Amino acid sequence: MNVLESVSQYKDRISVELNNTLTETELGSAKKKTGKVRDQYDLGNALALITTDRQSAFDRVLASIPFKGQVLNLASAWWFDETKHIIDNHIISVADPNVIIAKKCKVFPIEFVVRGFITGSTSTSLWTVYNNGDREYCGNSLPEGLKKNQKLVSNMLTPTTKEEHHDRPISPDEIVSENWMTQEDWDYCSKKALELFEFGQKKAKENGMILVDTKYEMGRDEDGNI
């Protein structure tokens, strides 16, 4: 079967399942937290993370797509398995194509955003900030003359806070001085974020793709391990 035939088969199957998507979940009496895409259930000694077919953009749910949850969940599980030599992760098991059973962790209130290119269109994107004239961003100094979509000389970590209403860009010095993280934890997590991104770039390149930017979240498990 060639690629075009394979794509056609997938399209046909998706068309049949357009009205059969996973948009809502219910897991008995377990305490539930609902995100834009994932539902989280507290199982006592672990968490059940259910990836639905909900499609979100710009902080809102727009639609649902057949099999999206399975693809996203299994892709995540694959990446976690591929990167466990860099840093441990929260996965206990993949209980279902849509479900991961995970360790409970206390998440650091910082999102580790790593960028390989100067691009984007949102108010917090690196290109928007740069195009507005800023040359200092999240503790990084940017040179003059950069063009949109240009590859950065080196990967850049641009952390943001995890706050209830609005995440804000923040520098490493501010992270420590404002007590978001200790210096030791920041040094370790920032190093691992850059290692993860470099590994992701390598894997993407091997498959004819580029990893432009991504976000990592980290935390401590009940044994104190990051």
PLM regions: where:
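A long amphipathic alpha-helix within ATP-dependent nucleotide-binding catalytic cores
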Residues: 181-212
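Conserved metal-phosphate-binding beta-hairpin within the catalytic cores
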Residues: 114, 211-226
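Active-site loop/lid in soluble adenylation, ligation, and acyl-transfer enzymes
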Residues: 7-160
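Secondary-structure junction/capping motif
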Residues: 6, 34-35, 171, 210
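A short mid-domain helix/strand-loop element embedded in enzyme catalytic domains
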Residues: 152-182
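Polar/charged alpha-helical tracts
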Residues: 5-8, 12, 183-187
